[in-house]
């Protein structure tokens, strides 16, 4: 394995170590399913989708396993799409962001385009565009204070080593 591959592997490993801590700080941990601000069934540290079974009480071990699984999906996608070297904390921020918005949203984002153009600060600034949710009650897009707080955490990580 080349030195460059070793460095990239170490960077990814370090980012993967940071990401669960970041997500747990942002999301907290809920062992019982709840409905988030957009009405989506959610559990553990922000897990959504088919792994969430309403009415089930999850254990810490189950939450840890789900978090690793879902971070892994985000990590593999980010690592495949980012074509340039980026700092460890920026990579952790992107894992968290992609975990939150999904791979499709990240893959088609201006943020990704800017990253691959090596415009890292501008890419980090794109996080502030992603603070909206669809409110099922008003049927409108609205700013979420919780999502803004999340983006502030992700932004701090994103720019930390620039």
Curated annotation (Swiss-Prot):
This is SAR-endolysin. Keywords: Antimicrobial, Bacteriolytic enzyme, Cytolysis, Glycosidase, Host cell inner membrane, Host cell lysis by virus, Host cell membrane, Host membrane, Hydrolase, Membrane, Signal-anchor, Transmembrane, Transmembrane helix, Viral release from host cell. The signal-anchor, which may also be an uncleaved signal sequence tethers the SAR-endolysin to the membrane until the latter is depolarized by the holin, resulting in the escape of SAR-endolysin from the membrane. It is an enzyme of class 3 (hydrolase). The keyword Zinc does not apply. It catalyses: Hydrolysis of (1->4)-beta-linkages between N-acetylmuramic acid and N-acetyl-D-glucosamine residues in a peptidoglycan and between N-acetyl-D-glucosamine residues in chitodextrins. The active site is at 27 (proton donor/acceptor), 36 (proton donor/acceptor). GO terms for biological process: cell wall macromolecule catabolic process; defense response to bacterium; killing of cells of another organism; peptidoglycan catabolic process. GO terms for molecular function: lysozyme activity. The keyword Zinc-finger does not apply. Signal-arrest-release (SAR) endolysin with lysozyme activity that degrades host peptidoglycans and participates with the pinholin and spanin proteins in the sequential events which lead to programmed host cell lysis releasing the mature viral particles. Once the pinholin has permeabilized the host cell membrane, the SAR-endolysin is released into the periplasm where it breaks down the peptidoglycan layer. The chain crosses the membrane at residues 7-23. It is a single-pass type II membrane protein. It is found in: Host cell inner membrane. Belongs to the glycosyl hydrolase 24 family. One of its GO terms (cellular component) is host cell plasma membrane. Its EC number is 3.2.1.17.
